[in-house]
Amino acid sequence: MGVALWLCPKRNTPTYDKLITVMSSLNTLFPGSPPKFEPHITITTNISLDLADQSKTKDDVDRILSASAVAMNSLPKNHESLVKLGNVNSQRKFFKKLYFEVEKDPNLVSFARIIRELFVIVPQDIEKENIKQNPQLYTKDNNGNTIRRKPSKKKSKTTEVKEFDTSFIRQAAAYKAAEWSVQEFDPHISLVYSDLWPLHSALWRNINTRISDIDWDIEWEFGVLKLVLCEGDVNDWVVLGSVDIH
């Protein structure tokens, strides 16, 4: 997943408190110790971010969060709530073991499409083209992945870099993002991460009982946007930065 953008309800709100309560309760129904995590909707994963240079990482995080906040605040104010919860569902996947479906609100879909285009597809496709145009800037790591060469500390002849037009790449990215938002974007709020499968009928009865104990007539507009490094164990995930949306 790499770096993901999350949309979270604000802390100390009815939505946040209810989700935390039911997530903690449901965790006890599953074997082992399922990892704990914040309630969130994943807007997109695989955001392009330079994690090698910490000073540059901070600038990139601030830039992405600022642009994301602008994009969200520019959405049409044509209805009350951006996020509306649907049914509880389950899949075989670890990260979608138990979750609330979230309605594909047109504004939420538009926001996800914008973020996917600007911070996933465009940088990835420009990098791919740069590898073709300027292979001298890249090398292979021990796993055979193409990575940028580190600048040499030795004085050497300046490497000539070929410039190329990115307008077509950016244009194509808009179409790719639109297609992704329709076919792949699946907004949801995970409740439990687990390897357990299938969920037997007795477990489902307990799940439904615990969920029905809470008034789920909740929805939220805006909230908090967080960039999260989702690598390794869930308990090791790191929030790189956040911004409140008003």
Curated annotation (Swiss-Prot):
Signal peptide: none annotated. The active site is at residues 40, 188. Substrate binds at residues 42, 190, 193. Residues 133-146 have a biased composition (Polar residues). One of its GO terms (cellular component) is Golgi apparatus. Coiled coil: none annotated. GO terms for biological process: cyclic nucleotide metabolic process. The keyword Hydrolase applies. Residues 147-156 have a biased composition (Basic residues). It catalyses: a nucleoside 2',3'-cyclic phosphate + H2O = a nucleoside 2'-phosphate + H(+). Keywords: Golgi apparatus, Hydrolase. Its EC number is 3.1.4.37. It is found in: Golgi apparatus. Residues 133-159 are annotated as: Disordered. GO terms for molecular function: 2',3'-cyclic-nucleotide 3'-phosphodiesterase activity. Belongs to the 2H phosphoesterase superfamily. CPD1 family. Involved in the metabolism of ADP-ribose 1',2'-cyclic phosphate which is produced as a consequence of tRNA splicing. This is 2',3'-cyclic-nucleotide 3'-phosphodiesterase. It comes from Candida albicans (strain SC5314 / ATCC MYA-2876) (Yeast). The gene is CPD1.
